[in-house]
């Protein structure tokens, strides 16, 4: 784990498409119960997600989200600045992108990108 004392950012040399592809490669919907579907848009650097709808109490509620690489980068930075959150692979992600992290950190970043905070621990 790394203790962040200043703003931490994913290396800006990691291309947007690669950053998003790294997330898609985790096959997160198979591992994260709140995430129903995740697809990388081949035409634009954008992730399309279907995830739990926090405003709907029904069991299979879902809401669609479009998440850009900029949103992923901003969510990662926000989480590293939050003293309540510890990303175990933050140093590796800073140096090489989310493909060098772990599913737990990708989970936290995706939740923050969709909901503005971590909901599902």
Language-model-detected regions and their locations in the chain:
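Alpha-helix boundary/N-cap detector
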Residues: 10-14, 18, 26, 63, ...
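Long, contiguous N-terminal structural blocks used for assembly/anchoring
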Residues: 1-62
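Non-catalytic, low-structured ubiquitin/UBL-interacting segments
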Residues: 84
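Short leucine-rich amphipathic alpha-helices used at interfaces
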Residues: 91, 95-97
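Short, compact, well-ordered microdomains
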Residues: 98-120
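A motif-centric signal for short, conserved binding hotspots located
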Residues: 78
């Amino acid at each position: 784990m790394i203790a962040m004392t200043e703003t931490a950012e994913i290396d800006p040399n990691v291309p947007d498409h690669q950053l998003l592809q790294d997330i898609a490669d985790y096959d997160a919907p198979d591992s994260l119960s709140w995430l129903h579907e995740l697809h990388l848009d081949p035409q634009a650097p954008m992730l399309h997600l279907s995830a739990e709808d926090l405003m709907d109490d029904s069991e299979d509620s879902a809401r669609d989200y479009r998440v850009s690489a900029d949103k992923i980068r901003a969510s990662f930075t926000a989480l590293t600045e939050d003293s309540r959150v510890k990303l175990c692979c933050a140093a590796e992600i800073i140096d090489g992108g989310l493909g060098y992290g772990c599913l737990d950190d990708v989970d936290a970043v995706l939740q923050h990108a969709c909901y503005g905070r971590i909901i599902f621990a």
